[in-house]
Amino acid sequence: YKTQVEKILTANGRATGVRLYNDEIHNANWIISAADGHGTIFDMLDGEYTNRKIRKMYDGSLPTHQMCQVSMGVNRDMSAEPHWLTVLLDEPILLAGEERHELGIKHYCFDTSLAPPGKSVIELIVRTNYAYWQRIYGRRTYDTEQSQVSDIIIEHLDKVHPGIEADIEFVDEATPMSYEHYTGNWMGATSGWLLTGKTMPMMIMGVPKQLPGLSNFYMAGHWVEPGGTVTLAAASGKNTIQLICSSDGKYFETSLP
């Protein structure tokens, strides 16, 4: 628990356990990876259990959820506003070298633990390109670009909610590099695959939760549930247990705590 897995152990085409980064080994009858899909397949399993379809999925050609996020604490009660608002911009804005035509604004007033009465936590989201941030990561340009993105987004937020810029008390920026660093998600993808014409068939047909040539192993999470979201990722865990019960000839039964 709370320890990173280095390798998934296998023997004779069967998953047998995991080795942690502290060299501890934990054996198991079944292994379920809810970790990053690319890291699971190509790092923890060394790419030994793939086929052409899987390699194509993870060759970088399919779009993924790559976002810039600006979070802020404001001295304003936003509870009467829509929880999530997508603003279509009259004029495109240039962020991280690309034009963007919309801005997502979300507040968290439904969770009173996040801010004291009369104040709010706001999150602003805009799509971006991982490769751009990767090129400048570790250089002074990276910090400068983060600040510029934040300034531009706040400027447009003030147009939607006049005067809110003066109410901002705290700002924090996150790029795909932030997501990659803190969550381990490949290319900093926040919700796995981005739903487009290319990836819609994956959502309709489903992404296999098992890997070719490897038994007693399943994947769960947004990399096997195109479209992402916490709800889909959580449901994939339940679906995985159903599949294991079926293979063991056991009845899957749920109960309320």
Where are these predicted regions, by residue range?
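Mid-domain catalytic core of redox enzymes
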Residues: Q4-P117
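Active-site-proximal substrate-binding core of FAD-dependent oxidoreductases
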Residues: T10, C245-P257
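Catalytic phosphate/nucleotide-handling subdomain of diverse soluble enzymes
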Residues: Y21, H38, I244, D248-K250
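Hydrophobic, well-ordered secondary-structure elements that form the walls
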Residues: I32, M72, L124, L157, ...
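Glycine- and acidic
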Residues: M67-C68, W133-T141, M219-V224, P257
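C-terminal segments that line or cap access tunnels to active or ligand-binding sites in enzymes
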Residues: N75-E180
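A glycine-rich dinucleotide-binding beta-alpha-beta segment and adjacent secondary-structure elements
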Residues: G163-P226
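A conserved FAD-binding loop/helix module that cradles the flavin
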Residues: H222-C245
